[in-house]
Amino acid sequence: MIKNFNSLANTEVRKKALLILESGLSSAQPKNFLKSFVSKNHILLGKNQILLSNYKRIFVVAYGKAADSMAEYVSKKINVSQGIVVVPKYTNSSITSKRFKTFYSGHPLPDKESVRAGRAVQKFVNSCTKEDFLLFLISGGGSSLLALPDEITLTEKKYVTKLLLQSGATIDEFNCVRKHLSMI
């Protein structure tokens, strides 16, 4: 996983530290943590198992820096009818299925594509019926990748985001402000 492992592991202590790091990185990979919640035609939420065959269609909205790998894993386990994936610009998305529409949005600052993705997700969600199952897969970076400014312009939202970045705000402080600036 660490590309230059051998050159970095030049002492026993460094080797052990790198092995610990690799173990942590591996456990954070979507396929490793999603397998606890997603299996063939089942979703596990807490102690509740959802049988997906009870639904007419299965929809997926995945957004964030790990969106494509989460959506890819899920699409191998369940029969996804259609989905939207929103990832940062310059990401080499691994999604090859034509059932997914992929948006490449701005991060950490939202951009026009973030708004376009936000509108697409809003329309997509509104098209679902009670016979459908909608699964959201959310990872870090989602609030800038998927933006739908509420009563402010995109330029104003970008300005507020820049101020928060420059101030050293924590992610909790970021989210507290941003949830009031977006419809999603």
Can you name each region flagged by the protein language model?
Residues M1-S139, S143-I184:
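N-terminal loops that bind phosphate or other acidic moieties
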